[in-house]
């Protein structure tokens, strides 16, 4: 039996053993209205217990991640052999038991359409990526976005690419660490598309090509339900009164600083995607389980639930990529370093054929850098809430 400290090291160290200031050139728009408050309405993406009731056979396919309380493992070939209803039962059970993280190995060689079929086993609305550049999508399968550094025969990128910064080093051991460093603003822990109302329910990321062992390219995940539960009761009560103002334009402006090929929003796109405010502590509508939420490059301010952001400040956040001091004080200096401790994190080292599914409302994740002499190609799908399949212009990088 491993000690708790040994388990923490295993979770932070890898998973191969477990699974063999730029501003847009366009003139500023007319002042935008204050951000809309995300409604957190009850949704039906998670099917009722009756429609996905597990059986002994399906439950036997769900196993713990070794040395971790976070995540579950489902064998890929066994999952593919099941009919749709049983696939859904297995994946839904694994998501619930795994705190929103599921690892599915041994799927090398599946087609993009098979990935879409698996995505429909997670939820009923798989998005078709409206607005994403066609070269970043699988031809004739618009649900699948390509992420990585792969190029076409002309040498042009055929994948959405964002360069992850180096990992910080532990101040005691000197080893790379996943714990967020407020000074370096690294790793780039985030939840996807917090600027949407409602945010997407889940994401699937499938490994087509991966750098060899030791060359980087891992993806790490953190359990925001466990982190929320570990907070002091009084602090949780204070956080329930706060909201994160999330802006799509602000997000793209910040990512563009690090990766100039990342697209900025046009004035029309900005007008079509106004900011929203999200609760810092988000309650699951089905179980009432609470999770920390809102860690995203889209967050430009943290406000009391009774306050609003002025249109002038929104222009500054969206057009100049600036953020209010409240973001650093709460999200970067306090919550992220706490929530990305080893006891809450899992690091996945990819093998070709691996699939990872995560609940976007209960987890955060981060990419890690890799040796760009090697190809890295990932396929990604996004599962929306049935009420939230609205247009957006791209996915963040895993």
Residue ranges, per PLM feature:
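N-terminal processing/targeting junctions
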Residues: 28, 35-42, 111, 119, ...
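Fe(II)/2-oxoglutarate oxygenase catalytic core
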Residues: 57-99, 103-357, 361-398
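Generic early N-terminus positional signal peaking at residue ~5-7
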Residues: 6, 24-25, 314
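Generic alpha-helix initiation/capping and coil-helix boundary signal
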Residues: 13-14, 112
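N-terminal chloroplast transit peptides
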Residues: 1-2, 17-38
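N-terminal mitochondrial targeting presequences
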Residues: 21, 43-59
